[in-house]
Amino acid sequence: MKRLSCLLLGILLVFSLCACQQAAPSSGEAPDQQAITEEATEYFNQMMDGDFETFFNALPQGVQDNISAETIQETWEEEVDKLGGLPENTSPDVSCYVPEHSDQIRVEFVIPCEKGDFKVFINYSPDGSLYN
């Protein structure tokens, strides 16, 4: 009985140590949100000019496997049409933040249109790499 108790306590101790272990430290400093915003703005402006390939080619392979540059462009154009078109000579409101319950970094572009706001989100991983 004593050996069984020691065995159970030993197993409990191992599980406790594993559960209380600190997370592995991040592999570097937090990414520069200004640099991320600038990169995302460049992608956004390219898409505004009709170049969806550059953004698509920068996406992770797993995302590229499930979507195409044409699909991104079609979705963009459908949304613009639904909102009554984009106003001429306008610049988006741009914000960069970490959404609640997420560790991603989001750059949000908003252009007020006739029938609502045209919104584009470009997400980055915590290490600063393009996510989607």
Locations of regions flagged by a protein language model:
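Short beta-strand edge/turn micro-motifs at domain boundaries
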Residues: 117-132
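Positively charged n-region of N-terminal signal peptides that target proteins for export
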Residues: 1-6
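Repetitive helical segments and hydrophobic/amphipathic motifs
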Residues: 11-12
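Short, low-complexity N-terminal intrinsically disordered segments enriched in polar/charged residues
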Residues: 20-49
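C-terminal motif of bacterial Sec signal peptides marking the signal peptidase cleavage site
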Residues: 15-19
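Short solvent-exposed beta->alpha transition segments
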Residues: 38, 53-104, 113
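Hydrophobic residues positioned within well-ordered beta-strands of beta-sheet architectures
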Residues: 107-109, 120
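Primarily extracytoplasmic ectodomains and periplasmic/lumenal surface modules that are beta-strand-rich
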Residues: 52-53, 129
